Amino acid sequence: MRLNDITRGTGLEEHGITNANLIYWTPPTAVLYEQIVKRGEGLVTHLGAVAVKTGHYTGRAANEKFIVDEPSSNDHIAWGKVNQPFDSAKFDALFGRMLAYLHGKDIFVQECFAGCSPDHRLPVRVITERAWHSLFARNMFVRATPEELVGFKPGFTVIDLPAFHAIPSVDGTNTETFIIVNFEKRLIIIGGTSYAGEIKKSIFTILNYLLPQHKNVLSMHCSANVGEKDDVAVFFGLSGTGKTTLSADPRRRLIGDDEHGWDNSGVFNFEGGCYAKIINLSPEAEPEIYQTTRRFGTILENVAIDTVSRRIDLNDDSFTENTRASYPITHIPNIVKSGMGGHPTNIIMLTCDAFGVLPPIARLTPDQAMYHFLSGYTAKVAGTEAGITEPQAAFSACFGAPFMALHPSVYAKLLGEKIARHGVSCWLVNTGWSGGPYGVGSRMKIAYSRALVNAAIDGTLNAGSFVKDQFFGLDIPTGCSGVPAEVLNPKNTWVDKTKYDETATMLVERFRKNFEQYRSYVSAGVAEVM
């Protein structure tokens, strides 16, 4: 049976789904709320958000992601630890069991787009067994109009079945959990995890494969906003480094908070929603994001809730530190409704330095920007991936290696060309530790990071003076309004200066060792940055 009183779309027979029970076709938020409550998937909170639990996985299952090894994509994929190959025949067998599992079950279907640019958007169909995952897809992707839903043809389909588990000895998976991309069949299958982030990041992987190759569009793991003078700022960074927080500025309009493309016209958001980390969120430091946790339509993942009063506690990390809010971007008051902007004036590369030796901000030359983009140094922040309980130093190419299907040099080449063509100012911002490493120093104050980013974007820092860092070769500003002068140079914040020198030297060596894999792909100027 199909509930088609909401809208009609193309049937599911093309996916092999023929024996489902009720099919909820592009249901609106209110209907999904009803189903979430009816099916015991979540609770409506005080003031109207819906709280859910993701179960065992409270972050991405990074080691359970695969790409089917098939002729159409084999030569293009950067195979390795991130992009693990999966046998085509085993995919077919596993998918066949998933179809059998769906027999007689209710399913939810959302039809939407990935990409705000009409020239580059990808039609996406998301099929889920849980109502709240359907709401997640509705929040996170670009909603289709009623006219666009008529005869909708998906370019890619996601089938997400958390209660279906693989059999590793039979299916060739590492565990019972799997996220498998099949470019030939234009299909993504997910099982054994309720963490909704797998849905959006799988589609991000698809765009990272398609757009650079076929459209010459740079796909970026970044947030973006625009000022009153139409000056666009792009913020690169891994989860937990501050992309969402620093780009949500009441004085600038938000283009998007996590995934963007950069084409010949400018930047555009891949998404129609935001997926913000909300642990210890405060109305004073992050008012725009805070108010979304009190809105109808927002999903609160793994947030503590009083089941009687339905009030939430954003400071409670008893389930995970990776508490999240998923909400449509329209919940943010100051946005670019089209999701598109011009070419960036400034690029901010965010890092969470667990060692506390990088400055809170530094100006980058074009060569340094390329080097740091390929390095993608940061820390794996607690809770962002399953099994991570405290920050760990890591290098993640393009500030998003887990989602990059092609070799990092493909993205770096496009970035370098665009920086040169448009004269973009580039900055490295450390939102991590100051005064010592994790466990000794303290996390950089959000207020300081905001002040530094604002001064970079409005040109104040460029107009001031700089000193050269002796270890990383970075230009460090000597002053910034709202930030104590001693904070700007990280060595000044350490009690043990000798220990700082030793730690900085160690990190430089880590940079050099990691960059060896890219030296043959870059110019001499980039290779000699460190």
From Swiss-Prot:
Residues that bind Mn(2+): K201, H221, D258
UniProt pathway annotation: Carbohydrate biosynthesis; gluconeogenesis
Principal location class: cytoplasm
Source organism (scientific name): Geobacter metallireducens (strain ATCC 53774 / DSM 7210 / GS-15)
Catalytic activity: oxaloacetate + ATP = phosphoenolpyruvate + ADP + CO2
This protein's UniProt keywords: ATP-binding, Cytoplasm, Decarboxylase, Gluconeogenesis, Lyase, Manganese, Metal-binding, Nucleotide-binding
Entry similarity comment: Belongs to the phosphoenolpyruvate carboxykinase (ATP) family.
EC annotation from Swiss-Prot or TrEMBL: 4.1.1.49
Binding site for substrate: R60, Y195, K201, R324
Co-factor remark: Binds 1 Mn(2+) ion per subunit.
Cross-referenced PANTHER family: PHOSPHOENOLPYRUVATE CARBOXYKINASE (ATP) (PTHR30031:SF0), PHOSPHOENOLPYRUVATE CARBOXYKINASE ATP (PTHR30031)
Function, in words: Involved in the gluconeogenesis. Catalyzes the conversion of oxaloacetate (OAA) to phosphoenolpyruvate (PEP) through direct phosphoryl transfer between the nucleoside triphosphate and OAA.
GO biological process, one term: gluconeogenesis
Pfam families linked: PEPCK_ATP (PF01293)
Official protein name in the record: Phosphoenolpyruvate carboxykinase (ATP)
GO molecular function: ATP binding; metal ion binding; phosphoenolpyruvate carboxykinase (ATP) activity
GO cellular component terms, semicolon-separated: cytosol
Subcellular location: Cytoplasm
